[in-house]
């Protein structure tokens, strides 16, 4: 598994409820831009239209060697999942406080672009502070155990 890009803010800003692996419908120039890692997922999210899941605001830069028929960098991209997974995700999206966002994009062993999407619930400010305290304590604990 070759990770292209990771959205690190997801783990800090949200509680992760459940994870899913989804295929992404892409065109050729988008795949080439992904291989060059010219992508941003900071503002991206998942929406549901007609019982299909779409990845919105995923910015894949235009491929420089492509001809004039290059892709739109922020177009919605369809996610490929099993029907049971789509029902589960869309059901959770309708609940208050739940959101679906991509955690990271990667190429699997066969070279196919995939997205790890997660169902999340937003953290409050005090939850974020507890996360920072736990992370700092783990660093300090490891430093003490190493003897330095």
Curated annotation (Swiss-Prot):
Q: What SUPFAM superfamilies does the database record attribute to this sequence?
A: Small protein B (SmpB)
Q: Which GO terms describe its molecular function?
A: RNA binding
UniProt-listed Gene3D superfamilies: 2.40.280.10
List the signal peptide residues: none
Alphabetical GO CC annotations of the entry are: cytosol
Q: Give the chief site where it resides.
A: cytoplasm
Q: Where in the cell is it found?
A: Cytoplasm
- Coiled-coil residue windows: none
Could you tell me the Gene Ontology terms of the biological process aspect for this record?
Answer: trans-translation
Q: Which InterPro entries match?
A: SmpB, SsrA-bd_prot, SsrA-bd_prot_CS
Functional note: Required for rescue of stalled ribosomes mediated by trans-translation. Binds to transfer-messenger RNA (tmRNA), required for stable association of tmRNA with ribosomes. tmRNA and SmpB together mimic tRNA shape, replacing the anticodon stem-loop with SmpB. tmRNA is encoded by the ssrA gene; the 2 termini fold to resemble tRNA(Ala) and it encodes a 'tag peptide', a short internal open reading frame. During trans-translation Ala-aminoacylated tmRNA acts like a tRNA, entering the A-site of stalled ribosomes, displacing the stalled mRNA.
Superkingdom is: Bacteria
Name of the protein in its database record: SsrA-binding protein
Q: Which NCBIfam families match?
A: PRK05422.1, smpB
Q: Which UniProt keywords apply?
A: Cytoplasm, RNA-binding
Pfam families the record matches: SmpB
Q: Which family does it belong to?
A: Belongs to the SmpB family.
Q: What is the lineage of its organism?
A: Bacteria, Pseudomonadati, Pseudomonadota, Alphaproteobacteria, Rickettsiales
């Amino acid at each position: 598994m070759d990770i292209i890009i990771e959205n690190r803010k997801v783990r800090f800003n949200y509680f992760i409820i459940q994870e899913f692996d989804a295929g992404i419908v892409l065109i050729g120039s988008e795949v080439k831009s992904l291989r060059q890692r010219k992508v941003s997922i900071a503002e991206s999210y998942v929406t549901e239209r007609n019982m299909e899941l779409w990845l919105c605001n995923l910015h894949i830069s235009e491929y420089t060697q492509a001809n004039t028929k290059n892709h739109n960098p922020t177009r919605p991209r369809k996610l490929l999942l099993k029907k049971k997974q789509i029902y589960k995700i869309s059901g959770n999206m309708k609940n208050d406080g739940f959101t679906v966002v991509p955690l990271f994009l990667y190429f699997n062993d066969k070279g196919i672009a995939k997205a790890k999407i997660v169902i999340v619930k937003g953290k409050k400010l005090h939850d974020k502070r507890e996360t920072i305290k736990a992370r700092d304590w783990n660093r300090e604990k490891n430093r003490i155990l190493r003897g330095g």
